[in-house]
Design a protein with these regions (language model features):
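Nucleotide-state-sensitive switch-loop elements of NTP-binding domains
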Residues: 1-13, 18-180, 320, 336, ...
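Hydrophobic anchor at the beta1->P-loop junction of P-loop NTPases
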Residues: 7, 325-327
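Walker A/P-loop nucleotide-binding motif
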Residues: 11, 329-330
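Short amphipathic alpha-helical segment that frequently serves as the phosphate-/nucleotide-binding helix
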Residues: 16-21, 202, 206, 334-338, ...
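Conserved catalytic-core segments centered on acid/base and nucleophilic motifs
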Residues: 26, 33, 201, 212, ...
Length: 620
């Protein structure tokens, strides 16, 4: 009977690295291992230095890997459900079925359905799940419960779900029930919570722990990753970070009293078979040694774009402008979004800062609560903030759909079916998108800055207009007087036009100057380009600075960064802006101002009185 290990944690804490090291370690012990990534922006292949796709791929003796590709999973799922009906059902019925299975609902359930296949699989001794960042991992793990309940309730009612009749997916309910039982079985399943000794990472881990516990999951262990070597950092300009980490290590021990492994930050990247094996030995067997950088020489990178160029990029010809910040989990998107918003608000522009990430952190950076309704921040008079809250968005979305259906003349029976479909788990995805779309229409602000979820999920959010456009077209064709569908179609067309218009919307990619974030950002840029959306700038975060007293550990990491900054320039061929590594956490306006000033290379948020050039008001 297979055992399972799930890795969960905030983006950028090293989940994939720790999952890979765990899989390799057990494989070297002679166990038959499969590692699976459920992250839409998987980087398993980057770490193994081998192409991995939507099929089980041999990596080394006893170890195979697989990336669950949402598109491939959707096609497989669609064919599994409607394939047997071909040649039996009339062509016009098949056309309707095929359209129904091109919905956003199908995309969500298909990837999740493939994931649950492995929770009822006994072919391997151990299956390691490298999951997406926590907000989306929680969503994935809730789905077996949600879908099982939805199928059960639909069977009692109309017998219909948003992805077809209950009769065609009843067998799935049994599989989902077995998956739920496997996840809750502490003798078979372990959840490793990976975090860094930092405020946002600890807060998100505690939230994940609580939510997983409510799902009936009990078997936890902790990996604290990215700890600086004390003797090295104490002699550097970043000595304050060591004091901060010691403080959080104590807090982690008290808040999460589970078996814990502390892992030192290495001076080189964990990439390639030998580096992974060496790292696994250091972490799990306590072997002496470090994983050093394979980059021995590098040219100093001096081609950062001037901050005024970033200010110019943000200037658009429309009154209401959008700025969308995206990138790999943990590269500093939230801090960058807050810094950009602070600069704009400090320059007298009415600015709205929005987070679409389920694990919202803008409140931690601003050091004040950010709720589900738009509110002015205390820190800056021209800055407002809001987070898209899934539960609130779902409630609002359901009420709106039902009200529109009533106005469109739906019968009582049709409303019953609609209400059942709205209980579908995929309603949450639609509701979040609807709220995102609604915020882009807000004309009260000069700028709307979006702090998005990690790249795979941001791309999914930005694909939704195209998915829903197909569904709306079908709704309009089916019921010509459907006001809701007609209105939705117009809104979708407007949103897609805005996203593609570089005079209206600015896309900025955030990277660390390391291999994996650069590769993921390049894939994101290419995917966006296919949708007609063009990235306009790259922001390199956590860039090290050195001087005569810098110890070897930081010199080696500095050399690695300089090498990858050169690669980033050739890869993106876009202006690269710089945020240096700071010696403390970015929490509150004083440190946020420092970030903004380093990025834009000018004073941020000055205390001003006098003439406002944007509104032509006299401020006293």
């Amino acid at each position: 009977m297979s055992r399972y290990i799930f890795f969960s944690g905030k983006g950028g804490v090293g989940k994939t690295t720790m999952a890979v090291a765990t899989a390799v370690y057990h494989a070297m012990k002679g166990e038959k291992i499969l590692i699976i990534s459920t992250d839409p922006a998987s980087n398993l292949g980057d770490i193994f230095e081998k192409r991995i796709g939507h099929a089980i791929t041999p990596i080394m003796p006893n170890l195979s890997a697989m990336d669950i590709d949402p598109d491939a999973a959707t096609e497989e799922y669609r064919e599994k459900v409607i394939g047997p009906m071909r040649g039996i059902m009339p062509d016009d019925i098949m056309k309707v079925l095929e359209e129904q299975f091109r919905s956003a609902c199908t995309v969500e359930i298909a990837a999740f359905d493939r994931f649950t296949d492995f929770l009822v699989n006994d072919e391997f001794d151990l299956i390691v799940f490298d999951t997406a960042p926590t907000g989306h991992t929680i969503r994935l793990l809730e789905l077996p419960v949600d879908w099982s309940k939805h199928i059960e309730e639909s069977a009692k009612g109309s017998g219909q779900t948003c992805i077809g009749p209950v009769s065609s997916i009843q067998g799935a309910k049994e599989k989902y029930d077995r998956a739920i039982a496997a996840m809750r079985d502490a003798s078979r399943t372990e959840f490793k919570l990976v975090l860094k000794p930092e405020k946002t990472s600890l807060a998100e881990t505690l939230r994940a722990h609580d939510e997983l516990s409510t799902l009936g999951i009990r078997n936890f262990s902790i990996i604290v990753n990215g700890i600086y070597p004390n003797d090295e950092i104490a002699r550097s300009r970043y000595a304050n970070l060591s004091t901060m980490q010691v403080r959080y290590l104590g807090a982690i021990e008290k808040a999460l009293p589970y078996p814990t492994i502390n892992v030192l930050l290495q001076s080189g990247e964990i990439k390639g078979p030998q580096a992974i094996k060496d790292f696994a030995g250091i972490v799990f067997d306590g072997k002496n040694g470090v994983v050093d950088s394979r980059i021995k020489e590098s040219m100093r990178y001096d081609n950062f774009a001037d901050g005024t160029a970033l200010a110019d990029i943000l200037q658009k010809k429309y009154n209401s402008k959008m700025v969308i910040i995206t990138g790999k989990g943990g590269v500093g998107k939230t801090i960058t979004a807050c810094a950009v918003a602070a600069y704009l608000a400090g320059d007298w522009h009415e600015t709205l800062l929005v987070t679409t990430d389920p694990a919202a952190h803008i409140g931690y950076v601003l050091d004040e609560p950010v709720g589900a309704t738009i509110a002015r921040t205390k820190a800056l008079p021209h800055l407002s903030a809001v987070r898209i809250d899934q539960k609130t968005a779902v409630g609002t979305y359901k009420e709106k759909i039902i009200a529109d259906a009533v106005r469109s003349g739906y019968s009582a029976d049709m409303l019953i079916v609609l209400k059942e479909e709205l209980e579908s788990p995929c309603t949450e995805e639609m509701a979040v998108f609807e709220e995102f779309s609604h915020l882009t229409e807000n004309s009260d602000f000069d700028y709307i800055v979006f702090d998005t979820a990690p790249t795979g999920h941001t791309l999914r959010l930005l694909e939704l207009p195209y998915d829903y456009a197909r569904q709306v077209e079908m709704m309009v064709n089916i019921k010509k007087d459907n006001d809701f569908a007609s209105d939705a179609k117009k809104k979708l067309e407007t949103l897609v036009k805005k996203l593609k218009d570089s005079d209206h919307c600015t896309f900025l990619l955030v990277i660390y100057p390391e291999y994996t974030p650069i590769q993921e950002a390049k894939r994101t840029m290419d995917d966006l380009a296919l949708a007609g959306i063009h990235v306009q700038g790259i922001i390199a975060d956590n860039v090290l600075e050195i001087d005569e007293s810098t110890p070897d550990f930081f010199r080696r990491r500095y050399g690695m960064q300089q090498h990858y900054l050169g690669i980033a320039e050739k890869t993106f061929r876009l202006p690269i802006f710089r945020i240096p590594m700071f010696d403390d956490e970015i929490i509150g306006l004083p440190t946020l101002k420092e970030v903004s000033e380093s990025l834009f290379q000018r004073e941020c948020c000055p205390e001003r009185s006098g003439y406002n050039p944007n509104t032509k008001e006299i401020m006293l």
